[in-house]
């Protein structure tokens, strides 16, 4: 049996080895990152409820700004200067909207994926969630895409297809699926120089697309962690009644391309959907529907607050409705308000506070606006500030 | 299809600096006995080989792997030598992040591909199964997408900011 010109069992493993080599090479070429091995088993059911960890950090909308994303992790002591996880057993929830408005969307997806794996090893955990911009992009709604955003996906597509060619040359590997299958070469009423970028973006992000499948299927749409429920826009009682686990599984199934076609389930579309709702995140406190919020919260046993992104809070992270609604989208991305990164921290023993890089809240209130104010631990402001008037 | 034409493809070169200290900072890792990631993929693969020689050096194993007939096309293409080096390095890598100790050969392979975009196309390597036309034969699906304003043609007045 073993008397070929190369009498080695090793040749049997080559297709598998080539495949992982090519994947690693493509990842590196796209992101500059070598991912550590994935410690989590694939295809496990998406978890919806989690015990309250010792330390929980919540991070708002990132919108294609890698630098600000890094800062957000840094001010909470979650990564070091070379982006390695230093958060130990901390649990992080990023409430969605990684995509759109900036040009480093894929780099952030890779950055988060790498940290997820490192955190897992250290006993920590990072949850990432679907925001309305994830849903829109999967659906082909590219209204908030930037030029750089098209370029980055184009680069991904080029390397991805090259990787497929390499795999095709290795006899013994199945012919990889063409990511562009069924995508038109041109689009009406669109500039011709955008066709390629748009095609790449559709290929990557449509249901069952390689990027959607690889990264976005791991996102929760709702998550209960201890006494907090996380969602990008907001939850109404009807959503909770429908079933949080059911929502997570259905959205994930849709992104996987299993069923549902192009468009997301109804509770992800429109103003009252879980990723679009603003009833609890209006900046003006008096516009928030505290009654609806309390009603919704009362239907999830043990939960006393809802933590949301989606609506930019010019005044920084804050709480309304007796801090039952905590709003953490500080518009940090350059493509949004270019806001100062702030994150929310909940410790099991000492409650809720805000970690900010805003120099105003630094130790010496009026001393200096230090140029280094963006690094290091910001002052921890006790209890979410109650903000009623917008600046 | 013009792949890999942009300079930005080589961006990763700049991120090469922080070569990781192998698994230095995972405090909870200590009791993880097996830690399979620290073996090279090659050693792992060889362990399943039917007639594997335990005493053979990793280097020799890697060389033997390179001689496998099924990768002849990859090895002989116009970026064949860069491929071989990168693949060899990857096989031998014992880093936590497989391949992270192979930045140089990876970058060399990238540059070669940037200079020879068709390095791994079938036609180049003499395989003529390329007869299938590159048109889009599968039916084009419904892809009515909503483009960003700046990509519309003709351009909209009231230009929105990006």
Curated annotation (Swiss-Prot), chain A:
Say if the entry is tagged with keyword Disulfide bond: no
Q: Which domain of life is it from?
A: Eukaryota
- Look up the record and name the cofactor or cofactors this protein needs: Mn(2+)
User: Where do the annotations place Mn(2+) 1 binding?
Assistant: 61, 63, 97
User: Where along the chain is the active site annotated?
Assistant: 133
Where does the protein principally reside? Answer: cytoplasm
Record's keyword terms, sorted: Cytoplasm, Hydrolase, Manganese, Metal-binding, Protein phosphatase
Keyword Glycosyltransferase (UniProt): no
Q: In which tissues is it expressed?
A: Expressed in roots and siliques (at protein level).
What does the record note about the induction of this protein? Answer: By infection with the bacterial pathogen P.syringae.
Enzyme Commission (EC) number? 3.1.-.-
Q: InterPro entries, per this entry? A: Calcineurin-like_PHP_ApaH, Metallo-depent_PP-like, MPP_Shelphs
Task: Please state where this protein is localized.
Answer: Cytoplasm, Cytosol
In its UniProt record, a GO molecular function of this protein is: phosphatase activity
Give the co-factor note.
Binds 2 manganese ions per subunit.
Per UniProt, Mn(2+) 2 binds at 97, 132, 232, 295
* Any Gene Ontology CC annotation: cytosol
Knockout-associated phenotype: No visible phenotype under normal growth conditions.
Q: Which family does it belong to?
A: Belongs to the metallophosphoesterase superfamily. SLP family.
What this protein is reported to do is described as: Shows phosphatase activity, hydrolyzing the artificial substrate para-nitrophenylphosphate (pNPP) in vitro.
The protein's name is: Shewanella-like protein phosphatase 2
User: Coding gene?
Assistant: SLP2
Curated annotation (Swiss-Prot), chain B:
Give positions of region: Disordered.
1-61, 119-162
Transmembrane segments annotated in the record for this chain: none
Bias class Basic and acidic residues marks the residues at: 125-145
Q: Where is this motif: Cx9C motif 2?
A: 102-112
- Where is the motif named Cx9C motif 1 mapped on this chain? 79-89
Annotated Gene Ontology cellular components are:
mitochondrial intermembrane space; mitochondrion; peroxisomal matrix; peroxisome
Phenotype on disruption: No visible phenotype under normal growth conditions.
What name goes with this protein?
A: Mitochondrial intermembrane space import and assembly protein 40 homolog
Main location as per UniProt: mitochondrion
Tagged with keyword Ribonucleoprotein: no
Q: Which InterPro entries match?
A: CHCH (IPR010625), CHCHD4 (IPR039289)
According to its UniProt entry, the protein's GO biological process terms are:
protein import into mitochondrial intermembrane space; protein targeting to mitochondrion; protein targeting to peroxisome
Disulfide pairs? 68-70, 79-112, 89-102
């Amino acid at each position: 049996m073993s008397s070929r010109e190369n009498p080695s069992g090793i040749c049997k493993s080559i297709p598998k080895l080539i495949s992982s080599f090519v994947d690693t090479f493509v990842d590196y070429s796209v992101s500059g990152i070598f991912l550590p091995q994935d410690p989590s088993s694939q295809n496990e059911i998406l978890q919806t409820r989690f015990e309250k960890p010792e330390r929980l950090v919540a991070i708002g909308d990132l919108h294609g700004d890698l630098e600000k994303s890094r800062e957000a992790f840094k001010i909470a002591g979650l990564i070091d200067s070379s982006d390695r996880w230093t958060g130990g057993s901390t649990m992080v929830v990023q409430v969605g909207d990684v995509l759109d408005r900036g040009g480093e969307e894929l780099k952030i997806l890779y950055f988060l994926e790498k940290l997820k794996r490192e955190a897992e090893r250290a006993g920590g955990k990072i949850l990432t969630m679907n925001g309305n911009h994830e849903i829109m992009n999967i659906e082909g709604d590219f209204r908030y895409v930037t030029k750089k955003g098209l370029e980055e996906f184009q680069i991904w597509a080029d390397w991805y297809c090259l990787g497929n060619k390499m795999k095709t040359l290795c006899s013994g590997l199945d012919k990889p699926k063409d990511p562009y299958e069924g995508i038109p070469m041109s689009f009406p009423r669109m500039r011709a120089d955008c066709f390629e970028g748009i095609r790449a973006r559709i290929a990557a992000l449509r249901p069952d697309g390689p990027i959607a499948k690889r990264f976005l299927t791991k996102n929760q749409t709702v998550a209960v962690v201890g006494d907090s429920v996380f969602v990008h826009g907001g939850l109404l009682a009807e959503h909770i009644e429908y079933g949080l686990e059911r929502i997570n599984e259905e959205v994930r199934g849709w992104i996987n391309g299993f069923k549902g076609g192009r468009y997301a389930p109804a509770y992800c579309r429109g103003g009252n959907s879980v990723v679009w709702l603003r009833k609890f995140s209006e900046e003006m406190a008096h516009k928030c529907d505290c009654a609806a919020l309390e009603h919704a919260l009362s239907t999830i046993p043990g939960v006393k607050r809802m933590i949301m992104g989606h609506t930019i809070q010019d005044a920084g992270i804050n709480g309304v409705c007796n801090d039952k609604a905590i709003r953490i989208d500080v518009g940090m991305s350059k493509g949004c308000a270019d806001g100062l990164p702030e994150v929310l921290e909940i410790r099991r023993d000492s409650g809720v506070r805000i970690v900010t890089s805003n120099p105003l809240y630094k130790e010496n209130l009026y001393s200096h606006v230090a140029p280094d104010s963006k690094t290091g631990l910001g002052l921890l402001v006790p209890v979410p500030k109650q903000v009623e008037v917008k600046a | 299809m013009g792949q890999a034409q942009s300079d930005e493809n080589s961006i990763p070169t700049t991120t090469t600096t922080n070569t990781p200290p192998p698994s230095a900072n995972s405090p909870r890792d200590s009791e993880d006995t097996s830690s399979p990631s620290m073996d090279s993929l090659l050693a792992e693969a060889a362990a399943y080989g039917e007639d594997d020689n335990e005493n053979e050096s990793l280097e020799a194993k890697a060389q033997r792997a390179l001689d496998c007939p099924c990768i002849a096309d990859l090895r002989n293409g116009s970026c064949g030598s860069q491929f071989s080096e990168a693949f060899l390095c990857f096989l031998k890598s014992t880093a936590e992040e497989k391949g992270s100790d192979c930045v140089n050969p990876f970058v060399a392979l990238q540059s070669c591909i940037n200079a020879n975009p068709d390095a791994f196309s079938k036609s180049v390597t003499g395989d003529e199964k390329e007869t299938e036309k590159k048109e889009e034969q599968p039916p084009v699906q419904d892809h009515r997408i909503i483009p960003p304003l700046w990509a519309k043609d003709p351009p909209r007045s009231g230009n929105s900011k990006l």
